[in-house]
Amino acid sequence: MSIKIKNFKKNIIINNNNFINENNCNNNNKNNIVQLCIMGDGGVGKTAVTTQFISNHFVYYYDPTIEDSYRKQICVSDKSYILDILDTAGQDELTAMRDQWIRSCEGFVLVYSITCKSSFNQVLNFREQIIRVLDRDDVPIMMIGNKSDLVNERQVTYHEGKELAQRLGMSFMEVSAKNRSNIDEVFHEAVCCVKRKEELYRIKSKHVKILKKNKNPLKKKINEICKVM
């Protein structure tokens, strides 16, 4: 049986009233675009989570995605950001496209369904692919367990999700796209993850420059001594 996959490019900019406060939010942030990639197995609700965040709307039907792009403005820690969200395919036959998606983004949200153990197990594979493509293991990644409203169909416990996330250094939440539980919080935390990593990288780079600067005079002095000898 073949699956007809539609690809609609959605470039939407929406103000999120839950996070934006015109009096407190700084709209002059120069680095205000945060590129997020939503990844996970097919059918876990990646599009449902994204659509609920973007337009407060729950998608009841399953229409497999190739690549959908969304934009939304939010305020995090009194700073305004535009989220550039890439909703990606989970189908195995489209795995070749993932490398390109990964390279285009700076933060990642890995989605599994609490009602499907195999989708939870696949999180490791998605994370490994991200690390392989970007060639670094400090990528801002968070993991979310969707469909938390389906308590009677649960196959993955909250503890299992939290333990895996902690072991791999990822932020973690359980969410429900259907009743909008923790949806805004996911994207708020995703921005924080990206910005924390950026700040750590900035501090690390600054320390490296200081160390190099301090080493140069010593190296010069040693060379002078060697010449004299």
UniProtKB/Swiss-Prot annotation:
Q: Which GO terms describe its biological process?
A: macropinocytosis; signal transduction
A GO cellular component annotation here is: plasma membrane
| Record's subcellular location | Cell membrane
Top-rank taxon of the source lineage equals Eukaryota
Q: Which residues are the lipid attachment points (S-geranylgeranyl cysteine)?
A: C226
Please classify the protein's predominant subcellular localization into one broad category: membrane
Query: What are the record keywords, sorted?
Result: Cell membrane, GTP-binding, Hydrolase, Lipoprotein, Membrane, Methylation, Nucleotide-binding, Prenylation
**Motif span (Effector region)?**
62-70
Q: Which residues form the propeptide?
A: 227-229
Q: Which GO terms describe its molecular function?
A: G protein activity; GDP binding; GTP binding; GTPase activity
The UniProt entry lists membrane topology as: Lipid-anchor
State whether keyword GTP-binding applies.
Answer: yes
Positions of GTP binding = 40-47, 87-91, 146-149
Q: One short Pfam family name for this protein?
A: Ras
Reaction(s) catalysed by this chain, per the record, are: GTP + H2O = GDP + phosphate + H(+)
Q: What is its EC number?
A: 3.6.5.2
Residue positions, PTM Cysteine methyl ester: C226
Q: What does this protein do?
A: Ras proteins bind GDP/GTP and possess intrinsic GTPase activity.
Q: Which family does it belong to?
A: Belongs to the small GTPase superfamily. Ras family.
Q: What protein is this chain from?
A: Ras-like protein rasV
Organism, by scientific name, is: Dictyostelium discoideum (Social amoeba)
